[in-house]
Every structure is written in structure tokens, then in C-alpha cells.
């Protein structure tokens, strides 16, 4: 039976794990709704991936305005695609302005989250404990760097580090740099070091389709214009429409997809050496992997005399460099592992335990999945932000977050009305997964190996239009939910401090 209110009932609380953009968006929503919450952050500052990644040449890979909180616009981006430090500075500035810091416990990594007695119980790496009614996992999926299992890696005599842990104490000039990896970070680091005159060797196993883009500075008039009455909202609507229509080629074959493929081939035509061009030409179609963005003309950079592209697998690390699978050796002073992240980890390595002692590791042992990117059966009152099947590539980040958070808030209130904790049913989750599986054929994300794919070859991102994502999350269907007893105090309705919707400023 649902719990009944009592004099000793604990106040309704939410714990958010992660103080990146998603966690902070959720914080503002809860704050306005009058719901008590605490954010646990393993690092010493907000920002998430923008705090962690500081490597040379890092620019946002989508338009700067796609990383704005809708309730706190920034009219003064320096460029169309802002440098990473500017994104991070905006997040910090907004967090201070909005008063979020008072809710955050920094240097507090949650290592265990367990649902028991109708509530979530948390333990930090320091041994501290906490209890809350709702658990929001806002950890993201680009937080656990992958270091390749290459023999001899620890024997290298010089500095070596992952791109997400870039060591800025290492002098850039006068070093022979080795960049292992050809994804977004590998491309941006290579071109940044190349134009500084460094000796750079990039080791790639697979070529990428690379977007050579222009990144102009924002003019004073553009900044002034956004401040005119009604102009910002108009420009945002135009931007969302442009993104949604412009990304339609990802969802189905047709002339738009053919035109995009042709455009990217023209970028490659800038490489004049036939042998180098062959190394840099992918053997799969455009969009199957995430498309690296080049702000400093990668194809021009790799044709500089100080840059070398080596195609193949690194077989061994030696104290003075690397050895390839074909036996060739390359002497290096510094190695950067631009080898990406464990994108299927999500909130792990945290141990998360739901009903009947079942852990997230057991549930995700064979396949990574969720209900609509926000919930999992068997884990009452645990909600994910940008979980499996989230709209990573075809919905603007603020829009996707508002849609997810809107659904989560409705689910929380539905549970509180019944004195219960809620989770999606197994049937609703399987129905959702069937819809996702049916939609993937014909999209660009099938047909090659990429980090979007689960163990059965199904991509775990949103394969439909933006409006369908909004429609899915716009209404709460109680028949899709399981209600389980919550602890005393979980009943009632929050008294809003401000407008309940975070984007209504």
C-alpha cells in the first residue's frame, strides 16, 4: 500500500548526480517547482564535459546557441562555434547567477545508489550517506575515458595522457607529438598542434568524414540585434527549424543525403597527394559515425611538412615511441590518447541497485536500453537525463532536455499524488524499444561500427524526428508506469516558487 503522511515523515527530496548542463537544467526546474534537492558532483566545479576537456583546438561541434540554457540566453558568443573555455565560462557564470552553487556538494562522487524502503539511499566515495525520494542520473556518457590496452603503454618515457586529461604543463613547441585516434578530439588536437609548427604524427585506424567549416567571429551588430525585443526568440525558432530540417538526411535516404555525401567529398578533394587522400578516405557512408568538426582546416593542416598521417594499428608502446602492426617504429616525445570514452557506461562505475536487489550492471549486461531515454523498469523514481535513446544528433540539446525534464516532472507528481515511486513497466519499455528498432533501417547510423550501436547491432539514440520526440514525452500515460510504495512524506504537491517550467523565463 502507498505510504501515508505522518508527523515524522521526511520532506520530499531529490538527489541529482552530476553538475553538467543536464543536472543544472534539472536543478533550475526543481528550484522553480519548490522541490528540495541536492546535487552531488565528483569534481570541484560545474560544467561536466566542458570542465573535463580542455585540449588545444577544442570548439563546440554544434552552434554555440545550442548550448544555452533557454531561461538564460547568451547574446555575446565570440564565434559561431565557441571555443570550449567560453562554453565552460558561460555555464559557471549562469550557475553563479542562478544560485545553484548552494545546492551542490563538490568533490563528492556517489559510488552507490540503492532503492530500499521506498527511497533512494546514497553513499559517496568518502563514506558520506544521504537519502532522497528521487534519483536523477545526470552523469552524461562522455565522462569515463578509454585508455587503449596497448602492450608497453606504461613504459613510455615521456609525458602521455588521455585527451580528456590534457597536460598543459607540457611545452608545446620542440616536441614530437603522437596523437593516437581519429575521432573528434584527435582531429582537433592534430590540426591545432600542426598550425603551431609542432612535429605531429597522427595514428589512425579508420578515416573519418570531416566537416571543414567556417567559424566566423560574431559581429557587434549580431550581438545587438539579439537584444532587440522579440528577436532572440525569433532567432531561436529559426535555428531549431534549420537544425531539424537540415538533419533530415540522417533519417532517410534521398537527394538531401546524396548532396551531403557529395559535399564532404569536395572537402577531401583539397588533399592533393593521392596516397594521403587514400589514407583519409572513409570506407563507409557519411554520418554512420559522429562527424568531427574542423575549425582550423584539418585537410590543409595534414599537408604541412611537419605533419605525418600513419594508417594502421599501434601494436606496442616503447620508451621512445610506438611500433605499428607492420613493425615500423616512430619516435615520439609526447603521446596523446585521443581514444574516446566508454559511452555505454552512463552513470557507472557507480553501483545502482533497484527492486529485488537487481543492479544496473545486471540489467545492462547484454544490452543498453531505457524507456524513452529517461527511465528503466525496476528502478522506481530513478530518472535519466540523456540516457539510452536520447536525441543526441537530431534534436537541439536545450529542446531535448526540456522535453525529458517535462516528462520527469509529470512522473514525479503522478507518484507523489499516490504516495508512490514510479518506474516504466517492462511492457511499455519493450514496446518503446520495438519502435526504435523498427525506425533504424534507412538511417545513417547503421552499416558500420560506431559507439551508437549496442551488442545486437541496434543504435541507442533517437532515430525519429524532433517533433516525434516531443510528442512521446508530452503526455504521461499511467498505464505505462508501475507504482510502488514510497517512504512517508512522498505524498502531496510541491508549492512552486516560480513558473514550474524552467524555460518560461
PLM feature spans:
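Glycine/threonine-rich phosphate-binding loop and adjacent beta-strand/alpha-helix elements that clamp
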Residues: 338-412
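C-terminal, flexible cofactor-proximal segment of oxidoreductases
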Residues: 209-212, 370, 383-505
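Beta1-alpha1 glycine-rich phosphate/pyrophosphate-binding loop at the start
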Residues: 12, 16-101, 204-205, 270-275
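FAD-binding beta-loop-beta segment adjacent to the flavin cofactor pocket
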Residues: 51-60, 151-154, 294, 299, ...
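Rossmann-like dinucleotide-binding core of oxidoreductases
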Residues: 11, 16-32, 36-45, 130, ...
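Short beta-strand to alpha-helix junction loop
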Residues: 74-93, 251-258, 285-297
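Feature captures the FAD/FMN-dependent oxidoreductase FAD-binding
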Residues: 79-143, 316
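Alpha/beta-hydrolase fold catalytic core
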Residues: 258-331
